[in-house]
Amino acid sequence: MSEVKMFSEPVPNVPWQDRPANDNHDAPIWRYTENPIIGRNPAKGVARIFNSAVVPFEGKFVGVFRGEQVNGIPYIYLGESEDAIHWNINEEKIKFVDENGEEFMPIYAYDPRLVKVEDTYYAIWCQDFYGAAIGIAKSKDLKTFVRIENPFLP
């Protein structure tokens, strides 16, 4: 296998599981044998969690998650974990605000990703905005998420 280089700060508490003996592909990562780690009905009104995006933050892990509600409509939820295996999912959807501090909630939001650039975290997701579009928000503290204008419109 080729050498893999990480371009990030060390994360000493990242959970790790050795490659399963029966795994015969050359990918640099493999699925955790206990997947899924978040079961059904993880928070009030949320039937399932999909497509999470997790970052280390202040000695623990924080993630943004597609929380599919019991009515089938997905929204973005925040979760925290000490070990990146056992998660506490907030019961409230992330309450996005615009740059003036006004509530600005996506109607239908799914498949979030989370990335840190310098001192700011950016959440990016797919959403319905008069058709399929990309949503984006920024946060310094992973508590307040400020929506940025949609970078790509339908």
Regions found by a protein language model. Give the residues of each.
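Beta-rich carbohydrate-recognition and catalytic domains
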Residues: 1-107, 115-154
